[in-house]
C-alpha cells in the first residue's frame, strides 16, 4: 500500500525555481515512485513550502532521502535540506477525491 507523506521545507530561491527543479527531475522522481499530490507555499511566508507526496513503500522514502544527486539538485534549487520535515500519514484517512489514489 502507498504511503502518504506530509512534508515541509524552507526554500530560498522561490517557488517557481523549486517547481522547475521538480519538473526537471521527473525521471528521478519516477525512479523512486514519488507522486506529488500537492505542493505550495504559505500565503504569508513564500519560503515555507508544504507538500503532500505519495511513495510506494518505506524503502522508496529511504531511497529518496539517501539520493545524494537529487539532494544536491534540491539544494541548488533553494531547498534548505536541513530544515526539511517529512511526516508519514497513517493509512487511516479519507479523501473526497479517491481518483488521486487509483493506479493509472
Each predicted region: which residue ranges?
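Short S/T/G/P-rich N-terminal loop/turn motif that feeds into the first structured element of a domain
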Residues: 1-71, 80-104
Amino acid at each position: 500500500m502507498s504511503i502518504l507523506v506530509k512534508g515541509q521545507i524552507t526554500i530560498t530561491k522561490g517557488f517557481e525555481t523549486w517547481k522547475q527543479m521538480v519538473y526537471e527531475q521527473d525521471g528521478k522522481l519516477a525512479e523512486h515512485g514519488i507522486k506529488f499530490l500537492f505542493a505550495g507555499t504559505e500565503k504569508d511566508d513564500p519560503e515555507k513550502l508544504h507538500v503532500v507526496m505519495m511513495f510506494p513503500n518505506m524503502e522508496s522514502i529511504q531511497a529518496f532521502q539517501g539520493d545524494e544527486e537529487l539532494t544536491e539538485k534540491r539544494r541548488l534549487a533553494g531547498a534548505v535540506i536541513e530544515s526539511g520535515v517529512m511526516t508519514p500519514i497513517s493509512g487511516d484517512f479519507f479523501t473526497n477525491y479517491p481518483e488521486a489514489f487509483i493506479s493509472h
